[in-house]
Amino acid sequence: MQVYPKFMRSAMATEHFPPVTAPEFAFLGRSNVGKSSLINALLGSKQAKVSSTPGRTRAINFFSLTTSPERQQPNFLFADLPGYGYAKISKSISAEWPKFIEPYLAERPSLALCLCLVDSNIPPQPSDAQLTEFLRSIGRPYLVVATKADRLSGNGRTKAKQTLSRALEAENLLLCSAKTGLGMKELWGEIHRVAAEATEAMKQNQRPPSA
């Protein structure tokens, strides 16, 4: 399905979040996990800035997506959250976490799914396990997306999937590559499925109670 992305805004405070209008998908992951590259591959454009400097993103960047160029209201939103786990920026991210990152993850009513990006080429990291544990504690559904899978052989992908799924308690894990397109169709399928369910749930909540 063709989508039409548009950058909305950057937010470093809860009052700067966009209005709740459509289901949202949060992209989270360690710095240099390939988060911006994956978002750009999904969008088919260079909307998210790719940097060789880890931790460049310090705000939540929101993108609106529509399935028609004429549509004004977004069908759903992508939220690109700051990377974590890099020594030089760990203190700054830790300081920002309670200000607007944790409130977004814990309280945002339109957040439909958290996409937790991990590097398929390295062992599971403690910070990744801490993130998924936090999401489970607040009842947020999440999908683990293992990036850079094009660098692994067939057996390597199988082993990585098993290891990461077990370490992160992931019932569903997708191996993806922004470079080759591996797993992107499946990832889009999951996003569209969740978006459709969340859109219907939001409509139900907006309907007045019957007499």
UniProtKB/Swiss-Prot annotation:
Lineage: Bacteria, Pseudomonadati, Acidobacteriota, Terriglobia, Terriglobales
InterPro entries given in the database record: G_ENGB_dom, GTP-bd, GTP-bd_ribosome_bio_YsxC, P-loop_NTPase
GO biological process: division septum assembly
Protein name: Probable GTP-binding protein EngB
Annotated PANTHER family: ENGB-TYPE G DOMAIN-CONTAINING PROTEIN (PTHR11649:SF13), MSS1/TRME-RELATED GTP-BINDING PROTEIN (PTHR11649)
Binding-site residues for Mg(2+), renumbered to this chain: 36, 57
Residues at which GTP binds: 29-36, 55-59, 80-83, 147-150, 176-178
Listed CDD domains: YihA_EngB
A Pfam family reported for this protein in Swiss-Prot or TrEMBL: MMR_HSR1
Function according to Swiss-Prot or TrEMBL: Necessary for normal cell division and for the maintenance of normal septation.
Keyword Magnesium: yes
PROSITE patterns: G_ENGB
A GO molecular function held by the record: GTP binding
Residue ranges of every copy of the EngB-type G domain listed in the record: 21-197
Keywords noted in UniProt: Cell cycle, Cell division, GTP-binding, Magnesium, Metal-binding, Nucleotide-binding, Septation
Gene from which this protein is expressed: engB
Keyword Cell cycle: yes
